[in-house]
Design a protein with these regions (language model features):
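General beta-strand structural signal in soluble alpha/beta enzymes
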Residues: 125, 152-156
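Rossmann-fold NAD(P)-binding glycine/threonine-rich loop
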Residues: 132-149
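Short, thiol/selenol-centered motifs that function as redox-active sites or metal-ligating centers
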Residues: 198-205
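Structured beta-strand/loop patches that form or line metal/cofactor-binding pockets in enzymes
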Residues: 155-190, 194
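ADP-ribose/adenylate-binding Rossmann-like module
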Residues: 120-132
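N-terminal basic/disordered segments at the start of proteins
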Residues: 1-54
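Structural motif
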Residues: 8-14, 99-104, 126-129
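A short, well-structured beta->alpha microelement
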Residues: 40-92, 106-109
Length: 205
């Protein structure tokens, strides 16, 4: 199977504070953890310890070529957005998996409506911030995905993402080796642990 391509949408990581009738959606997880992890911290080695960074460089963990595009939105926005499409300034890149992190719900809904036209097969919305999406909105988003013929996952948190009934999401977990951490212990004939092989790590690294 060919490599899956990712389209990632997130809020910008800024110190801006919301004013009246505004709300802030954090971009910290995407900017400081998930994206550096996908690119093996090559653009932000300071976010990883020296020992960790040195070890990671020995492994094929740079998936930069599999990121079709990244779309960043202002972290502070109106509480309600009447015309969410106006915030989509550029055409969506062709991709297989859409991942949204900390995006304004009105913009997220508009993105899910549009991603099928860009070839998207699955939507992953990790809920690192428990206040971001409430249960009723998650059900609405799942229904929208089903209407659009999209696979979906709303892990809370991202490191709880596990394989299930959806083929493309299962392939995403295998290709990018992220989700619920999984490892294998290697022992010698006497039962002593000689090595630990990590097959899947948490998306934050």
């Amino acid at each position: 199977m060919r490599s899956l391509k990712l389209f990632i949408a997130a809020s910008k990581d800024t110190p801006d504070l919301p004013g009246f009738f505004q709300v802030k959606y954090g971009g910290e997880f995407a900017a400081r953890k998930f994206l550096p992890h996908l690119t093996n911290f090559k653009h932000a080695p300071m976010l990883c310890t020296k020992t960790c960074y040195g070890f990671r460089q020995k492994l094929p963990l740079d998936f930069s070529e599999d990121i079709a595009g990244i779309m960043l939105f202002p972290s502070v926005l109106p509480e309600l957005i009447d015309d969410a499409e106006a915030y989509l300034k550029e055409p969506l890149p062709s991709h297989d998996i859409f991942i949204a992190v900390g995006v304004h719900p009105d913009i997220l809904i508009e993105l899910i409506k549009q991603v099928p036209d860009a070839g998207c097969k699955a939507v992953i919305v990790p809920r690192e911030d428990p206040t971001w999406l409430d249960a009723s909105l998650v059900e609405k988003l799942k229904s929208l995905c089903e209407t659009k013929g999209l696979e979906y996952a709303f892990p809370r948190p991202f490191c709880s993402l596990s394989k299930g009934k959806f083929k493309y999401i299962n392939n995403f977990i295998d290709q990018f080796k992220v989700g619920k951490p999984n490892y294998r212990l290697v022992t010698d004939e006497e039962g002593n642990i000689t090595d630990v092989v990590v097959t899947h790590s948490s998306p934050c690294g």
